[in-house]
Amino acid sequence: MKPHTVSLVLSNLASLAAATCKCTPGHACWPSLEEWSRFNSSIGGQLIQSSPVAEACYSGPKDNAACQNIEKSWTDDVFQVSQPIGYAWPLNLSCPLPTPGLDTKCSIGNSPVYVVNVTCEEDITRGIKFAQEKNLRLVVKSTGHDSQQRSTGYGSLSIWLHNFRKGFRFQGHNPVLATCPKSGWKGSTLTINGGYSWRDIYPAAQKQGLIVIGGLDRGPCSTGGWTQGGGHSPGTHYFGIGADQVLSARVVLASGKIVVASPCENEDLFFAIRGGGGGTFGVVTEITVKTYPTKALSTINLIVGSKGDETVPKFLDAVATIYSLLPGLSKKGFAGYGNWVVRALSPITAKNYTNLYGQSWTLLGATQQEAENLFQPFKEEIVKHQSENGLEVTVSSGTFRDYFSYYYSMGNGTDSAVGGVSALASRLLDTEALQGNRKDLRKFLDSITQGSAVYHTLIHHGLEAAADVKADPTSAVLPGWYKSILLDEFEIPMNTTDVDAYAGSFEYLRNELVPLYESLSPDTGTYMNEADWGNMNWKKDFFGSHWDRLLKVKTRYDPEGFFYCPKCVGSDDWVENKGGSLCRA
């Protein structure tokens, strides 16, 4: 082959690579400093060159005073959210806090290289245009509360919505009805324009005497991935999943066009952004959601505890009974959150339990006496497990004047610690799984407690048995939510964000525990926002029967697949090279 022919072939190959892979630092196609500067000027100086959150703690840029503040604030949710590349639950963190005795290093890793600090919709459209012109990977981040790592991306440009705040307003009517009679909702509403966390919304809602369906954790963004991915809350049993509250939305598309999505405009997009996942179909800048008059509520609180391995069989007998009672409790109107563990890594509570089940149920609109009376038959079944050899059962009750008084009593008036991660998976369990065969359920509990200590978080939403809440056909919420009683999240704690160091824990979850859960409840799936990032059946488990329809919406509104995130609709058109660029599959 002649030299000029070889050069031509190599040139064509380089062009082909540029066309099929996103540009990353070090490649000839990466924008020059001058180009970045011009882009920064076009968005009013809102471009941030990223630096790792803990960078000040490392030699070179080390700043002892700044480092002390970072160390003190590291697990503070508000602190991490306020950082352009701060994340609540980071995996493979490339710049952890230095640990004495360990050779920790600091780099930007898979975090975005530049960040658009969005303050208006025009910043978003200009960021999209620049990323498309320069063939850059774009990621969308509101608060970074994401176990799936969807708001990170090697060599990317980030659209950061934390400081985009144009206000929120409560209304005694549904403004969507003025242009869209099909909206249907005739109650009060809340319009949120910007990247407000639920912590911003809840105090105002309480003052208005209203219930807003938002996260149990008040840290996530109200217009972001929590809502777009589904969203469970203390009010889910009574009012439905978070995504189903949305009446309309403003969305910035990959084309740069800003559209309204409602039952009357862009109906297919309206369907997709309500449960089809965030960061996928466009950038949502505003939503209008349903609100509800607040009510008094009562609670039933349960603790079952024991010490030592010898009590584990009787403890699991009690857990099996509680699980089997959940569908019946749902029919009576009870719902709530719980936790349990067998052989805890360290003793729990002042009684030093090693095996503990704790649950708090709510009954909206009921007095304390009414709640106690309705719970009595269930209490009698649970108390039967109390024994002289150390299995203790405690049941108490309470009452609250309104929804948010209860919410704040749960400790949610303060922000939960962030920064730590775990090997996590989850499954929605239906009535058949919980009540179909008691012996099979008990064997299942034995099987999932044979290995390392696994900590369970229970979201007893009870939608399968909810009398007044049904699946919305105009919503992409996973159908399994409305065909199940319980979301069981199971996790193994990690002392580092290094996934490779805990490869055995992830293998145990994926190869041992997850198949057992799938066998118990095969057709329900799980909640995409609180699931294993390595789930191999993610299309079925995260989207269920909606997958094909969502893929059509993706193709219509983002035909080039510009918006990419892992395990999202359309993501299998791309491949993430380890430590490198994003390329066409």
Swiss-Prot record:
EC number(s) per entry: 1.-.-.-
Record's keyword terms, sorted: FAD, Flavoprotein, Glycoprotein, Oxidoreductase, Signal
Keyword Glycoprotein among record annotations: yes
Cofactor requirements of the protein: FAD
GO molecular function: FAD binding; oxidoreductase activity
Knockout mutant characteristics: Leads to the loss of apicidin F production but accumulates apicidin K.
Family: Belongs to the oxygen-dependent FAD-linked oxidoreductase family.
Name of the protein described by the UniProt record: FAD-linked oxidoreductase apf9
